[in-house]
Amino acid sequence: MSFEIIAKDLAGRVGKLYTKSGVIETPALFPVVDPRKQELPSAVIERYFGQIITNAYFVYRLTGGRAVDIKKVLSWNAVLMTDSGAYQILRYGSVEVDPDEILQFQARIGSDIGVILDLPFDYEEPYESALLKVEETIRRAKRASAMLDKLEDMLVVGPIQGGLYLDLLATSAREISKLGFHIFAVGSPTTLLEEYRFDLLLEVILHVKANILREAPLHLFGAGHPLVLPFAVALGVDLFDSASYILYARDDRIMLRDRTLRLEDVKTDYLPCSTKLCHKPVKELREMPHEERIQLIAEHNLAILREELLEIKQRIHEGTLWEYLEIKARAHPTLYRFLRSLGRYKRLIEEYDPETHPETHGLFFYQDTAESRPEPHRHWSRTANLYTPSKVAIVIRAGEKPYNKSWEYRYLKSLVGDRAHVLFYDPVFGLVPEEVAEIYPLSQNEAEGESEAARAFAYEWLNNYDVILLYRVDLPMLSKKVIPLRSLDDVLHYI
């Protein structure tokens, strides 16, 4: 197995996952197909996705443990992933199958990617019970690890459990990471997704990501809504699976990129989208037979999910994934709250986020979220130990970019030469020394508002100087000789 990373932004990756039946471009979603009843033909799913997931436990029960060609059963010729029945444990408490047997069964029926049978639990599980289930999952994972070479080239997923207990998540992630699985997965997020607790779910992902092998593919079970996908990808999730497309369709729920509509709530003659479904009059949709409507809405939902993943991939290539998160975060308060809190994980995000992209784009910063982004923190950490060539600082607020091409800077340098160190005051980065002004993205950005953290950094940095001359900048300091300049020519009075 090989996982090749093509492009990065934040902790998100565009990559290629090689399986025995083909290559998956990530981020990728596996639509769930029920082997007991296919409500949407495989040919329809294949128009939008080149991979599916089905429940090996259901197949096991249907055949009495007899191996069948699962791809032939489902009329599917591309990459196929199987789950082991863990979701049924979450819902009903147990399944009647041995963990080792169901893993071997997945290989025998021709699965390209299989999952060990872990013990999932929801986020309300008491700590003592959660600890026991994590320990049992690790024991099962160790047994599965010993079988990896005997599973007919099937890639195997190691789920990481822990609920909202961060110590259990970290322990589980570290232990599972040692066992040689091809893919890791975040377990038991379903309840959080159902309750729109996106902020808690994303925090779980961050803690898992911090404790697994850096380059390993990461799967998120049960996530299939366009709102959560870009955030999960930004934190390092590569693979998803979901039955949301068909579950929503059964209830006449129609996915859009930023929300979900119920058919009964649509007031316009047509839906506000551009898929095949959206060209049908709403009145006609309401009057058609329910089964026919399910198929149409399900196909529409698949199309919307595909659109979302394509947008995410393009954003990663551009290096504008954060800007996309800014847009999506306004769709739900928990997403907005999480985006603002990402500064707590700045070191982790900065570690994964590439400094440059093949095709750089100007970045957009907003006052309420700028402090959470990795770029300002990277600048502050790097300039903290930068040599200061003079004990006299001139701080100017220049409007033209790059800053060291502005007329103010060029005129100032003609007056003082190297007798003072020129710094540019930036509302996001704080102070930008003249010698690094053209480094991306210090001059390649647009900002709205001023970051308090940037101002705090400016005060800290200015402690390196004995005399501070300010031009069009308000930075009062009691402990320093701070002199506001009415014009640039006034600088000659002090140097």
Swiss-Prot record:
Top EC category: transferase
Cofactor: Zn(2+)
Pfam families, alphabetized: TGT
Entry binding sites for substrate: D118
GO biological process: tRNA wobble guanine modification
Function: Exchanges the guanine residue with 7-cyano-7-deazaguanine (preQ0) at position 15 in the dihydrouridine loop (D-loop) of archaeal tRNAs.
Protein name: tRNA-guanine(15) transglycosylase
Gene this protein is translated from: tgtA
